[in-house]
Swiss-Prot record:
Upper lineage: Bacteria, Pseudomonadati, Pseudomonadota, Gammaproteobacteria, Enterobacterales
Species whose genome carries this gene: Sodalis glossinidius (strain morsitans)
Record Pfam families: AICARFT_IMPCHas, MGS
Family, as annotated: Belongs to the PurH family.
Protein's name according to its UniProt entry: Bifunctional purine biosynthesis protein PurH
Top-level taxon of the source organism: Bacteria
Length: 529
């Protein structure tokens, strides 16, 4: 085992200067000679730290508006030089060993995220010298430490104190892995951005923002290994997107309970994304990635009670999501009534945590304040490929709707229609949702024919003694035939909301008129497979 390597000389060159002054001071206080470039060097010098400009060290000035700063043999020889192997050649050419490199890269992602960013700006924010130093140091991690993240500064200083100014090979190897991950993600961003610019680059009139890159490079960070995947014979892990901008299962904090399973995470995501769509206090209960009970109300407790009563049988062992902080009364109702796998809410108050503490197997997550879903990409793996599409963040408002029947919906029917339309978006296709007074009373999910989803929704309502008469019905896609409308009329549905767009729309509308049903077209489909 190699003994810890002393850090005697460090090169610091960072775009993100978070924590760099304190870190540089810590290094200097421990006898480390500091080399630096440009703005980083000025910051250290103004703080009174002894620092040598790289241009003074190499005898070669920065040039070309800073494009060439560190690409010099005295820099890269000092980083790449193998101790005890290249010592003679380093002495011959007056190359001093550099034991630590502290670098983070030009803010390419932040630059191209601006709507007004030009290609020229993007080009100027492609770092060249930085990644070269990072990769050089990571390659020579046997002798050199590479630090690319300010979050690692305190741990590096602590280990140097533990080992008299030195770092272990294990730590240098771990830092090298982080460095390669950092440069891989950086190059991926650049490739994805310019790949999406191809149409504009070749004079195509199509807007480049509407294109997907020619090659797709993804950067996800492993959050946890799992006991197994969807089934016990499958290995699994959970990876998260470091750029996730909104509250999600990936960013949530687990407050108690066993480790989340693969299925827990998938179901919790479905529940949370559904509950986000409501502005009133809402509860969504999910089983096998399908909502089985959804309701809104004036209080969280009332919303939970109403959602649970939709389908108590399916709610057993389910996932419960709220869009308000969880309170003690609601927590008491849950644990007294049902077995639950996961509860997720923006926050969980202390009294509620006290109630749930008696059920330590219940996984409790706090996800933070909810925002409206942000645009992004959805992926579906197929054998030999990856389907990529824009995330379905579409939702309709009153002004988007068309009433196509003779009978107009009442205000209450319109509210119920919009409510169950939101729910239908999160139900596996073919999806049918019955709702009354902003509460689901029957959900038919995942059937191969739409009419059978409608029949199942009615059966579920009847099994729980819920009256469908006067309810609204949502369908995630258009009705191809009138049989779905006939099935809805048979159980007393009074209002139907659906996308429209079938070649048989006239027949469907005629069926609704025949039954005295109000029908609303959304002109937006929400298939979910």
């Amino acid at each position: 085992m190699q003994p810890p390597r002393p850090v005697r000389r460090a090169l610091l060159s960072v775009s993100d200067k978070t924590g760099i002054l304190a870190f540089a001071r810590s290094l200097s206080e421990r006898g480390v000679e500091l080399l630096s470039t440009g703005g980083t060097a000025r910051l250290l010098a103004e703080a009174g730290l002894p620092v040598t400009e790289v241009s003074d060290y190499t005898g070669f000035p920065e040039m070309m508006d800073g494009r060439v700063k560190t690409l010099h043999p005295k820099v890269h020889g000092g980083i790449l030089g193998r101790r005890d192997i290249d010592d003679a050649i380093m002495r011959e050419h007056d190359i001093a060993p550099i034991d630590m490199v502290v670098v983070n890269l030009y803010p390419f992602a932040a630059t191209v995220a601006r709507a007004e960013c030009t290609r020229e700006e993007a080009v100027e924010n492609i770092d060249i010298g930085g990644p070269t130093m990072v990769r050089s140091a990571a390659k020579n991690h046997k002798d050199v430490a590479i630090v690319v993240n300010s979050a690692n500064y305190p741990a590096v200083v602590a280990e140097m104190d533990q080992h008299s100014g030195s770092l272990t090979l294990e730590t240098r190897f771990d830092l090298a892995i982080k460095a390669f991950e950092h440069t891989a993600a950086y190059d991926s961003m650049i490739a994805n951005y310019f790949g999406s610019q191809v149409p504009a680059y070749h004079g195509d009139a199509k807007q480049p923002s509407g294109r997907f890159p020619r090659t797709l490079n993804l950067n996800f960070i492993k959050k946890q290994d799992m006991r197994y995947g969807e089934n016990s014979h499958q290995m699994a892990a959970f990876y998260t997107d470091p750029e996730t901008p909104e509250a999600s299962v990936a960013t949530a904090q687990q407050l108690q309970g066993k480790a989340l399973s693969y299925n827990n995470i998938a179901d919790t995501d479905a529940a949370l994304e559904c509950v986000k769509t409501f502005t009133e206090a809402a509860c969504v209960i999910v089983k096998h990635a399908n909502p089985c009970g959804v309701a809104t109300s004036d209080t969280l407790l009332a919303a939970y009670n109403r959602a649970y009563q939709t389908d108590p049988t399916s709610a057993f062992g389910g996932i419960i999501a709220f869009n308000r902080p969880l309170d003690a009364d609601t927590a008491k109702a849950i644990v007294s009534r049902q077995f639950v796998e996961v509860i997720i809410a923006p926050a969980v108050d202390d009294d509620a945590l006290g109630v749930l503490a008696g059920k330590q197997n219940v996984r409790v997550l706090a996800c933070g304040n909810l925002q409206q879903p942000s645009p992004g990409l959805d992926f579906k793996r197929v054998n030999g490929g990856l389907l990529v599409q824009e995330r379905d963040v579409g939702m309709v408002d009153l002004q988007d709707l068309s009433v196509v029947t003779e009978r107009q919906p009442t205000e209450e029917e319109m509210r119920d229609a919009l409510f169950c339309w939101k729910v239908a978006k999160f139900v596996k296709s073919n999806a049918i949702v019955y709702a009354r007074y902003q509460r689901t009373i029957g959900i038919g999910a995942g059937q191969m024919s739409r009419v059978y989803s409608a029949k199942i929704a009615g059966i579920k309502a009847a099994d729980e003694g819920l009256d469908v008469k006067g309810s609204a019905m949502a369908s995630d896609a258009f009705f191809p035939f009138r049989d779905g409308i006939d099935a809805a009329a048979a159980v007393g549905v009074r209002c139907v909301i659906q996308p429209g767009g079938s070649i048989h729309d006239n027949e469907i509308i005629a069926a609704a008129n025949e039954h005295g049903i109000a029908m609303i077209f959304t002109h937006m489909r929400h298939f979910r497979h």
